[in-house]
């Protein structure tokens, strides 16, 4: 082993040991190790079978559900549970790894789309999974085709890896890669071909660029698409969801390839994440019973429908970061059978995306159909989100705004309503969780 690698391992593992004893999570160990040896990740990851999960929405939950299943088989699975998905975070994850008791080293990693190509210079995944690609942080990623090409460039570096794609996305039709490809998707009852919502991106035929129609449109640009001009249509699915048995704001049940599964997480969009997890598990040889056991133990993860109590109020924290994700979160809370207060926390830091114009493309108009007695607009850009909420027609006198997340917390604590939803952009979610953790309402880290 090279001296620089030895020094990098010493610096990284020592700092991780100290930080863990202090109860602090950080990507500092990875950053320190990489300063000694920029290739250290290659050394750390060389004996692992690696599954990479990437895409715009659903990475964290898909990864968590997959890890839950694989733990039923291997007992121990390396992962990055708090969503530290850039190279310093991935390196930190491997530095913290413990020896496998089964002799099988397996890692399931969510990786940021823009970081994937760089990371794939140092790791050799056996499976890539792309959940979806939607418009997200335009100032960082650019438009959807730019993001997709970044991911494909990374995948081409590992031509032996299988690629598991959301077959319901037209973007993923016949990707220009040498890798073997498999698809998962919804195979529910189809109807007459119709256009998607007028504000939907990524609906051009991948063959002739005509506007696609959908015989089944689950949400956004996903579903059983067909081109009436050239006949292009969704590819055959290798893993098929054939029935929605139950769908609520906090759980769902569904049938995939003849087996019924359930998760204690609400919303249609999260069923796609469960479908991806099933597809990964089946690809790796997991039997349906073990998948069910993994799902039965699954719970919401780090800011993604994470539930807790503020006083006697049952609260749910939901990450939002782009128009499609926010709209699906709103669709999910709309399923709640009880009144609830709503807090929407908008920041505009680098990790959130500095351009906040995306809030105008999210379907906040649905809140006027819900039993919401009061709304808190919070975060650095509280005035912008307050303005967006007023435009929906929701009564202005029921909207309060503040830059102080501490004040948002106090408002929830003092409200009459017994339920609360908090929709927050990434750094606002982290800041709000830190407030909660300091009060010992939630744990600082979710492992």
Annotate each language-model stretch with its function.
Residues 110, 131, 164, 273, ...:
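Residue-level signal for inorganic ion chemistry
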Residues 76, 126-127, 161-162, 180, ...:
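Residues at the starts of beta-strands that form the adenosine-phosphate
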Residues 2-204:
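Phosphate-binding loop of NTP-binding sites
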Residues 66, 70, 90-94, 274-284, ...:
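Buried hydrophobic packing segments
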Residues 1-15, 19, 24-26, 202, ...:
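ATP-dependent carboxylate-amine ligase
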Residues 62-63, 118-119, 139-140, 173-176, ...:
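Short glycine-/acidic-enriched loop or helix-start segments at secondary-structure transitions
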Residues 185-323:
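Adenine nucleotide phosphate-binding catalytic loops in nucleotide-utilizing enzymes
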């Amino acid at each position: 082993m090279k001296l620089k690698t030895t020094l990098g391992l010493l610096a990284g593992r020592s700092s991780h040991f100290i930080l863990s004893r202090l109860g602090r999570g950080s990507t500092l160990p990875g950053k320190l190790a990489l300063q000694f040896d920029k290739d250290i990740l290659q050394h750390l990851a060389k004996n692992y079978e690696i599954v990479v999960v990437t895409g715009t929405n659903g990475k964290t939950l898909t990864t968590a559900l997959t890890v839950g299943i694989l733990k039923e088989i291997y007992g121990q699975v390396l992962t990055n549970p708090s969503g530290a998905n850039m190279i310093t975070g991935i390196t930190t994850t491997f530095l913290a790894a413990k020896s496998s008791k089964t002799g099988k080293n397996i890692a399931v990693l969510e990786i940021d789309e823009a970081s994937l190509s760089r990371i794939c210079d140092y790791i050799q995944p056996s499976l890539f999974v792309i959940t979806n690609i939607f418009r997200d942080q335009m100032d960082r990623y650019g438009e959807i085709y730019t993001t997709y090409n970044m991911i494909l460039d990374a995948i081409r570096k590992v031509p032996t890896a299988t690629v598991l794609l959301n077959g319901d996305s037209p973007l993923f039709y016949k990707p220009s890669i040498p890798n073997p490809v498999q698809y998962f998707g919804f195979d529910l009852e189809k109807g007459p071909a119709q256009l998607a919502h007028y504000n939907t991106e990524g609906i051009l035929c991948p063959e002739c660029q005509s506007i696609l129609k959908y015989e089944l449109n689950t949400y956004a640009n996903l579903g059983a698409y067909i081109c009436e001009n050239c006949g292009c249509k969704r590819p055959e699915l290798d893993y098929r969801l054939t029935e929605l048995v139950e769908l609520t704001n906090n759980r769902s049940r569904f049938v995939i390839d003849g087996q019924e599964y359930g998760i204690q997480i609400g919303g249609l969009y999260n069923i796609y994440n469960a479908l991806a997890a099933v597809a990964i598990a089946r690809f790796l040889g997991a039997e349906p019973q073990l998948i069910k056991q993994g799902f039965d133990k699954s719970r919401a993860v780090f800011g993604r429908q994470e539930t807790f109590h503020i006083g006697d109020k049952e609260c749910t924290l939901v990450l939002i970061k782009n128009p499609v994700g926010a709209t699906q979160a709103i669709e999910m809370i709309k399923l709640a059978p009880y009144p609830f207060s709503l807090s929407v926390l908008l920041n505009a830091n680098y990790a959130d995306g500095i351009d906040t114009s995306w809030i105008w493309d999210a379907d906040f108009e649905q809140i006027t159909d819900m039993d919401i007695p009061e709304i808190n607009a919070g975060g650095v850009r509280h005035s912008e989100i307050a303005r967006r909420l007023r435009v929906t027609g929701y009564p202005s006198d029921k909207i309060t705004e503040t830059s102080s997340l501490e004040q948002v917390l106090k408002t929830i604590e003092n409200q009459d309503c017994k339920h609360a939803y908090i929709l927050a952009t990434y750094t606002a979610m982290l800041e709000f969780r830190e407030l909660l953790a300091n009060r010992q309402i939630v744990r600082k880290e979710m492992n």
